[in-house]
């Protein structure tokens, strides 16, 4: 499974740098000079192209990245919208209990401890207050805090996430 670690927002300047929106918890590890990145025009098309990073610098909450072979604004602008991806098999295993990669949680069926089906985890949102699970259900979407008091169990093998929601939480989606 491919995981997106960054997205090219636009070209920067005339020498071929690109502005990259970071989508990884490890930008210092993923975006370093000498590292190889695979860029794809979209998630569903082709194998993409590999680039070697020549330079990186911070640009607010984004990065300015110089890629080998991208030496002018036109070439850089051609990368606009490209996604930098890695293979999930390349991720190190997680040693901490009750800790998961986002892609492991996305797609899990959500049910309550009483056995009521709620929906499917569509996305994991990272906020200043903590992680939220965006759960798609028949009535729309419900945001469930990913905390031990609410998420009682996660079974990756069975593809089920069990919650004990406080009163009213599931009513917010309707």
From Swiss-Prot:
GO function terms (MF aspect): ribosome binding
Protein name listed in UniProt: Ribosome maturation factor RimM
Name of the encoding gene: rimM
Family to which this protein belongs: Belongs to the RimM family.
Domain notes: The PRC barrel domain binds ribosomal protein uS19.
Pfam families (alphabetical): PRC_RimM, RimM
Keyword Cytoplasm assigned: yes
Start and end residues of each PRC barrel domain: 96-169
Quaternary assembly: Binds ribosomal protein uS19.
Keyword Cytoplasm: yes
Xref: InterPro entries: PRC_barrel-like_sf (IPR011033), PRC_RimM (IPR056792), RimM (IPR011961), RimM_N (IPR002676), RimM_N_sf (IPR036976), Transl_B-barrel_sf (IPR009000)
Chief subcellular location: cytoplasm
Subcellular location as annotated: Cytoplasm
Keyword annotations: Chaperone, Cytoplasm, Ribosome biogenesis, rRNA processing
Function summary: An accessory protein needed during the final step in the assembly of 30S ribosomal subunit, possibly for assembly of the head region. Essential for efficient processing of 16S rRNA. May be needed both before and after RbfA during the maturation of 16S rRNA. It has affinity for free ribosomal 30S subunits but not for 70S ribosomes.
Gene3D superfamilies from the UniProt entry: PRC-barrel domain, RimM
GO cellular component: cytoplasm; ribosome
Gene Ontology biological process terms from the UniProt entry: ribosomal small subunit biogenesis; rRNA processing
């Amino acid at each position: 499974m491919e995981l997106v670690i960054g997205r090219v927002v636009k070209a920067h300047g005339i020498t071929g740098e690109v502005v990259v929106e970071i989508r990884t918890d490890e930008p210092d590890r993923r975006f370093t000079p000498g590292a190889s990145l695979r860029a794809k025009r979209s998630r569903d098309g082709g194998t993409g192209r590999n680039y070697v990073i020549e330079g990186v610098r911070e640009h607010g909450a984004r990065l300015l990245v110089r890629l080998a072979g991208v030496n002018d604004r036109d070439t850089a602008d051609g990368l606009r919208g490209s996604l930098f991806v890695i293979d999930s098999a390349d991720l190190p295993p997680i040693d901490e209990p009750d800790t998961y990669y986002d892609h492991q949680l996305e797609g899990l069926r959500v049910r309550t401890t009483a056995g009521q089906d709620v929906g499917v985890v569509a996305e994991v949102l990272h906020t200043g207050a903590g992680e939220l699970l965006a759960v798609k259900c028949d009535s729309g979407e419900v945001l469930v805090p990913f905390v031990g008091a609410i998420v009682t169990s996660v079974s990756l093998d069975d593809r089920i996430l069990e919650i004990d929601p406080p009163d009213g939480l599931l009513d917010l989606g309707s």
